[in-house]
Amino acid sequence: MRKYFLLFVAVFATTFLFGQSSFKKSDIYLEAGGNGLFGSINYERQLTKRPGLGARVGIGFYSENNFYLTIPVGVNYLFKLKRENSFIDAGLGATWSRSDGKVFGNSKNPNGDHFVNFIPSIGYRRHTTKNVMWRVSFTPVANKYGLIPWLGASIGKRF
């Protein structure tokens, strides 16, 4: 858990270490479905001067009878489309959760141990002139039980 916290702090700290530019390099957004499984709040940082390679980290949840914490992390690449401020968003990520749920497998882990889902993603992203970003994506969940089709939708603020 300490590793995940340190990763989050390191990514967040880079926001304040780089100079200002006209391209907004940071996003904070809410996501339904997607990498956080049911819902999450995420921070994303573009690592290049223009849209391209980025990294993200978040905190989310999923629910069966109880709520379970998830920690999605990942990298993505934004491919610019002809339409202004439109991108194909392709990424690879992993989501840690406290327990594997029946939603993503046949049975609960009897030890109540942590569980990792690997989540590739492909989607469409749009940045508006008012520094709002939104995204829709296909984010299949790959784990020891197989591949589960999954979708995500995000909306947030660029800064």
Q: Residues of each region from the PLM?
A:
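OB-fold/S1-family RNA-binding modules
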Residues: 43
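Bacterial Sec-dependent N-terminal signal peptides
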Residues: 1-24, 155, 159
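Transmembrane beta-strand segments of Gram-negative outer membrane beta-barrel proteins
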Residues: 22-32
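Outer-membrane beta-barrel transmembrane domain signature
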Residues: 23, 35-38, 47-54, 60-159
